[in-house]
Every structure is written in C-alpha cells, then in structure tokens.
C-alpha cells in the first residue's frame, strides 16, 4: 500500500512557526497509521478552577498532555504557569484574552470564589457570546450549577453525575469525553 501522503507536502506547526516539509523527505513509516490534522491557528485553552479541586485539575492536565501528543494544535494555560515575580493578575487576564476554549471545573468552591466570579467569569461569558469562544463545564461535585448562568452551557457531564461521585474508571470516561470534545473543536475550526 502506497503512502497516501506521498504526493503532498506536510505542514508542521511547532511553537507557532509553520514549516512546510516536502513529503518525499519524510520516511514512509513517519506518516503511516497517524492522523494528521492541519491547524490554521493553535487553539488556546484556559482552565478555571478552585484550588480546593486541584486533584481534578491535575488529572485534567494529564489528559491534556496525552491529547497534545496525539493531535497537537493547542496550548493549555492555568494559574500553575504563573512564576515567582510575575504579575499574577495580569498573567490571568492575558491568558483569558488569548483563550478560545475555556474549561471550567465547576464545584461549590468554584462558584463560591469571589476571584473567579469577578475576574474570570465576566470575560469568559462575554467572549462566549461575542467571539465564539467555547465554554466546557466539567462538573466536579454537586453544586448550584443549574442555578448559575453557567447552566446556559451544555456541561460535559450531567449534574447528577459529578466527578466526585464517581469511581475512577467512570471519571476517566468523563475526561475522555472532554478530550473528544476538545479534539472536535480543534478539527472543526
């Protein structure tokens, strides 16, 4: 079976630089059995969470790192990327401004956070309405999600099936569902 990419050039996107590589320079096995996705722009993912939900944040980051290995096309950002000496509020604002996918780990602690309510949710909701930013709510624990303005967005999981109420294999299936949704957004846009 001949390599279907043998007569085309491959666009490789690394660190926001586009490099076109003639396919004849790629070993045939380099592209076989791999899905190649052409990305117009690298998507920027902003992750909003309450620090009380850090274990779910960490699990999300692990899943995103695996997804990035397989499809690329995005950069994820959470407050873990803020380093000593940086103006943390400015870093969060910049990341919010740049993001076109927002992942919200919704819990009672998340909804109770004044910082999230006053600094993160307003730009997220504004961009979702005006700029086609995708808002993906991952329901971490039972909360007032259905009474909040976030309930306008279809959540990844059902309010009666939150991550905290699930055994680990079921949690993993919800994270995989979220990864499928992110991949769909990246491939479609």
Each predicted region: which residue ranges?
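Conserved TIR/SEFIR loop-to-helix hotspot centered on a Trp-containing motif
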Residues: 108-130
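Inter-lobe coupling/hinge region of RecA-like P-loop helicase motors
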Residues: 77-80, 157-167
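Short, polar/flexible loop-turn hinges at active-site or ligand-entry regions and domain interfaces
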Residues: 111, 145, 162-170
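Short beta-alpha junction loops
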Residues: 108-109, 138-146
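Conserved N-terminal substructure of TIR/SEFIR domains
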Residues: 14-105, 124-134, 140-141, 169-189
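Glycine-rich, charge-decorated loop segments at or immediately adjacent to ligand/cofactor-binding or catalytic sites
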Residues: 143-157
């Amino acid at each position: 079976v001949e390599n279907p990419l043998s007569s085309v050039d491959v666009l490789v996107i690394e660190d926001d630089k586009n490099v076109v590589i003639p396919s004849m320079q790629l070993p045939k096995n380099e592209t076989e059995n791999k899905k190649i996705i052409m990305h117009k722009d690298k998507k920027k993912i902003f992750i909003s969470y309450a620090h009380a939900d850090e274990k779910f944040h960490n699990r999300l980051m692990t899943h995103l790192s695996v997804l990035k290995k397989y499809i690329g096309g995005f950069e994820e950002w959470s407050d873990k990327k803020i380093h000593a000496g940086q103006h943390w509020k400015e870093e969060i604002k910049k990341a919010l401004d740049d993001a076109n996918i927002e992942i919200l780990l919704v819990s009672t602690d998340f909804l109770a956070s004044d910082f999230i309510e006053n600094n993160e949710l307003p730009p997220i909701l504004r961009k979702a309405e005006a700029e086609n930013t995708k808002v993906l709510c991952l329901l971490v624990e039972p909360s007032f999600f259905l009474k909040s303005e976030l309930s306008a967005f279809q959540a990844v999981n059902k309010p009666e099936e939150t991550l905290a109420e699930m055994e680990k294999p079921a949690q993993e299936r919800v994270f995989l569902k979220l990864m499928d949704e992110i991949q769909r957004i990246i491939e479609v846009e």
